[in-house]
Amino acid sequence: MSFERLQRDLHEAIEGVNRYNPENVAELAACVQAMVAENKYDKDIVLTILKLYQLNPERYDENVVRQVLLKTLMVLPSSDFALAKCLIDTNRIGSQELRRIFDLGAVLESCNFAVFWKLMKGTYKPTTNPNEPFKVPAEISKMIKPMAGFEDAIKHYACRVISVTFQNIEKKLLSSLLGGASDKEVTALAKKFGWETKENGEVFFVANHEGTIKTRNIDEKIQFSHVADLLTSNVPPLAF
């Protein structure tokens, strides 16, 4: 069954008091599988199945949890990955497979795209540090391979980060941050994000961040009842 069909049926099934009906677990898991295969995403569904696993530990399926975590990484910089981690019980998070995803998430959340692409391309060299998170780097690319659209999603995430951190960026550096993307792909992404070419196309103008700074006025409404006791108290004011 297609993702759209499963999604429609599930949103009807998990509405209101039926949201955490354990009988929905099988259909939710099938929908997650469809998300992976068809490169789709539904935040409500992935968070609902994690909550159901918390409430019904006997139905827990780590394979589905891994897929959910990887899908939430594909929508960075949203907070879905952080939310998903919070819905996994502490007695589960020590799993080697889950730790591997958490370590990958830490790399992406810190915008360390150089390490990510090395892991994807098989060029990452593990350190001798006992706490080295990627002792077997090949496991990362193997884990991600079934996730349709994962690398493209990370490229778009990198572009969003670039949009808020760079004013100008060289094409060579941009290509590197996008995993060695071709000139054609770099140009297409630059156009999509509204970056202009400069210096014969070797540099992209991203944004004039200094010219787009917006001030914010913060108003706080204080009710009279909140300060009435202070105004009527006999405590003398502090001397400076």
Curated annotation (Swiss-Prot):
Residues 41-221 form the PCI domain. Gene3D superfamilies: ARM repeat, domain 1 (1.25.40.250), Winged helix-like DNA-binding domain superfamily/Winged helix DNA-binding domain (1.10.10.10). The keyword Protein biosynthesis applies. Keywords: Cytoplasm, Initiation factor, Protein biosynthesis. It comes from the Eukaryota. The keyword Transferase does not apply. Belongs to the eIF-3 subunit K family. Component of the eukaryotic translation initiation factor 3 (eIF-3) complex. Component of the eukaryotic translation initiation factor 3 (eIF-3) complex, which is involved in protein synthesis of a specialized repertoire of mRNAs and, together with other initiation factors, stimulates binding of mRNA and methionyl-tRNAi to the 40S ribosome. The eIF-3 complex specifically targets and initiates translation of a subset of mRNAs involved in cell proliferation. This is Eukaryotic translation initiation factor 3 subunit K.
